[in-house]
Regions:
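Sequence/fold signature of self-assembling virion shell proteins
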Residues: 2-3, 163-169, 205-345
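N-terminal alpha-helical "arm" segments
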Residues: 1-48, 340-345
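Extended low-polarity, hydrophobic cluster-rich segments
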Residues: 101, 182, 190, 199, ...
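Assembly/oligomerization interface modules of large self-assembling protein complexes
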Residues: 27-97
């Protein structure tokens, strides 16, 4: 039962310092979330001012690629086809977490009420960040390209898994071959690369083999942003590659994570100590450019079994954020800029 009785003032006690409590509060590293947030203006500028309601869709428009006409002669009466645009609709998901506290729970407790509440909110923000990061990895994997050049060098395209496979004997050149495959598909610039727990140490080893070493391997990682994410290869892409060694690569700035909360939370309204409650917002405590919706209301409650009193007041809270995970769109059916790679035996 969650009642804070373990820290109630029943014996001589002291609070554990926050640093000593870090193991309990550890958080899965999430570099892809930070990059996705940084990329949001590359997709569409100031989405929050465009989307005014949960019921309102947000659509963007981009030019379609023109088809080649492959002419070989000149003429006086040539004709041409007009270009076109395509519509891109942002798809939104909502992430929420709830918590609650009895008003008198801190009256006889070594922990203060404000510290209890701040700790619960911090933990719920951690959970939301981890959920969003995992969802973003899953979305990238699900949206990987199913289209490849007819001939590919330095890798084999597995059309069943929609992945470019590189032989394990070439693991020291894995990222060079990845770059080669991307170049063959006309992606010559910077790459954002998510690697699983198997490829992460391989990438670290390659990065350590610089020009001063007898074997220079670090050149492979130039203009690549390598981001380890252990969701990949453990929760995502496991059925196709149970031994792991999976990576997802895509051109820099071609995916974004776009956060949003409704105007009633941004503007704020209501009164907390009522059954109607309040609408408010709060920033992310880790420094990410995330704003959470915060809903709270009070209710009469018997808190005697939860560290409070029989005539207590319980305040219920809900944190939330709406997000759109957007990936660069290509008009060719089943083609995307997301390329999955795997190291195979």
């Amino acid at each position: 039962m969650a009642d804070y009785t373990a820290s109630a003032l029943l014996a001589a006690q002291a609070k554990i310092t926050p640093r000593f409590n870090e193991a309990e509060m550890r958080e899965r590293q999430n570099p892809i979330l930070r990059v996705g947030l940084q990329n949001q203006d590359y997709i569409m500028q100031d989405v929050s001012s465009i989307k005014q309601s949960e019921k309102r869709t947000v659509k963007g428009y981009q030019f379609k690629k023109l088809a080649a006409t492959n002419g070989t002669t000149r003429s006086h009466n040539f004709t041409g086809n007009q270009g076109d645009t395509q519509e891109v609709t942002l798809s939104w998901s909502t992430f929420t977490e709830t918590l609650g506290m009895f008003g008198q729970v801190a009256a006889d407790n070594v922990e203060q009420y404000s510290d209890m509440l701040a700790n619960q909110i911090r933990q719920k923000q951690i959970i939301i960040r981890e959920r969003i990061g995992a969802a973003l990895i899953a979305a990238l994997h699900a949206g990987r390209t199913a289209v490849s050049n007819a001939t590919v060098r330095n890798a084999t395209f597995n059309s069943s898994n929609n992945a470019f496979e590189i032989n394990s004997g070439d693991k020291d050149q894995f990222f060079a071959f990845m770059r080669s495959v991307m170049n063959q598909h006309k992606y010559y610039g910077g790459l954002d690369v998510m690697v699983d727990s198997v490829l992460d140490p391989i990438a670290r080893k390659i990065a350590a083999q610089g020009s001063a070493n007898g074997t220079n391997l670090s050149y492979q990682l130039q203009n690549m942003n390598i981001m380890p994410h252990d969701t990949l290869g453990t929760d995502v892409a496991v059925s196709a590659y149970p031994a792991g060694a999976v990576a997802i690569a895509l051109p820099a700035n071609s995916f974004a994570f776009i956060p949003w909360i409704p105007a009633r939370y941004r503007n704020g309204q209501g009164m907390l100590l009522s059954d109607i409650g309040i609408y408010a917002s709060m920033p992310d405590d880790s420094g990410l450019p995330l704003t959470y919706s915060l809903r709270g209301y009070a209710e009469r409650a018997d808190g005697s079994s939860n560290g409070g009193t029989v005539d207590d007041v319980k305040i219920n809270w809900q944190l939330g954020v709406d997000v759109a995970t957007q990936i660069g769109v290509i008009s060719t059916a089943n083609e995307t800029p997301i390329y999955e790679f795997a190291l195979t035996t």
